[in-house]
């Protein structure tokens, strides 16, 4: 699944356009490497996302095309940093 779509479906970032801008701006890495919006993600990958002055690390647990809002948090595991809504 594309990175920008995963960030939106998992609700780590609420809108796909914002997810795309974040990755184009160099604020998202996959397994320590800079990521483009079209980068593919899979279970086990570690995402690092900079939100202003804060950094959050997530491990991808599952990938699904659609998911209910209440189940979205089960798609990832927060590894560290501070979660931003």
Per-region residue spans from a language model:
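Strongly charged
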Residues: 5, 16-21, 27-85
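Extended boundary segments
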Residues: 1-11
């Amino acid at each position: 699944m594309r990175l920008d779509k995963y960030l939106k479906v998992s609700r780590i970032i609420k809108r796909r356009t914002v997810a795309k801008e974040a990755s184009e701006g160099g604020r998202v890495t996959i397994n320590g490497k800079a990521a483009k919006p079209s980068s593919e993600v899979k279970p086990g990958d570690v995402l690092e996302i900079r939100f202003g002055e804060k950094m959050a690390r997530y491990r991808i647990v599952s990938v699904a095309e659609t998911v209910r809002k209440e189940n979205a948090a089960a798609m990832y595991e927060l590894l560290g940093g501070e979660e931003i809504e």
